[in-house]
Each structure stands twice: as structure tokens, then as C-alpha cells.
């Protein structure tokens, strides 16, 4: 009887662990959740984001867990989504490839597919970098490339 109880407790423990693991997105997901919650105590922007998760796409919150550099971008999303704030990428030298970030606030809130460039615009951002380096043109932004892709779909 004692062995049966021990086996049942082990099975129950494994089941509870499996459920908790899946709900949290894995061990690292659980650690990330807890880490951000702790950081939110001293970061008002992060606190606002976590208190208003319903205003953000799930993928955006998950990206924030993996990359805290996104705090400002995510924080501004509700008021800036759909807006693009420039028609150039800045100074460019032909033969040199500029570093562009898809979550740059100048174009990152522009629509791309079912989300915004800042979340899934690595292709348009990379393409804009290549065009700038090959041609020296600074007037092809990640949003321009994404717009072309959206029309082509």
C-alpha cells in the first residue's frame, strides 16, 4: 500500500509539473515572467505594459520577455500603432551597410502582415539595409519594403 501511495504521489507531482511547465511557456518562460514582474516594480513603463497586457499582441509581450530593449517600443505601441514617422533611414554611404532595427520607432509601428514591422519585419528591415548599402539610397525604409510586400501578397 505504501508503494502505491508513493507511485501515485510521483505521478501526481509529474502531472502538476507538466501542467505548470506548459502554462508558463517552460522553465525559462516562468523565470522570465518572474524577472519582468520584479523589474516592473521599479520601472513605470514596464509596470504599465504588464498591467495592460490586453492592449498588446501576445507576440509582442513574449518578445518583450526575451528582449528588454523593446520596453520603449512596446510601451508606445497603443498610441503609435499604424504610424510611420520618417521617409528616410538617415545618412547612408554606398558600399557600407547601415544597421537598422525593425523596432526603430521611425517605422516599427507600420503595418506588416498581421502585425507591425517592429515584431515581424526582419525581412523588410534587412532588405532596406541591403538596398542602402548597394545603392547609397536612404529613401527606401523598412516600411517601404513592407508596403511593397503587403501589396504583392
What residues fall within each predicted segment?
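N-terminal Sec-pathway targeting helices
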Residues: 1-12
Amino acid at each position: 500500500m505504501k508503494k502505491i501511495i508513493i507511485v501515485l504521489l510521483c505521478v501526481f507531482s509529474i502531472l502538476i509539473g507538466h501542467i505548470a511547465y506548459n502554462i508558463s511557456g517552460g522553465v525559462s518562460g516562468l523565470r522570465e515572467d518572474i524577472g519582468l514582474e520584479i523589474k516592473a516594480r521599479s520601472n513605470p513603463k514596464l509596470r504599465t505594459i504588464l498591467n495592460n497586457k490586453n492592449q498588446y499582441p501576445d507576440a509582442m509581450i513574449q518578445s518583450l520577455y526575451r528582449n528588454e530593449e523593446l520596453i520603449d517600443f512596446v510601451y508606445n505601441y497603443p498610441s503609435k500603432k499604424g504610424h510611420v514617422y520618417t521617409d528616410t533611414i538617415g545618412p547612408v554611404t554606398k558600399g557600407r551597410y547601415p544597421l537598422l532595427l525593425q523596432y526603430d520607432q521611425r517605422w516599427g509601428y507600420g503595418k506588416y502582415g498581421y502585425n507591425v514591422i517592429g515584431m515581424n519585419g526582419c525581412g523588410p528591415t534587412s532588405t532596406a539595409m541591403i538596398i542602402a548599402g548597394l545603392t547609397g539610397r536612404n529613401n527606401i525604409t523598412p516600411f517601404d519594403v513592407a508596403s511593397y510586400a503587403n501589396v504583392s501578397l
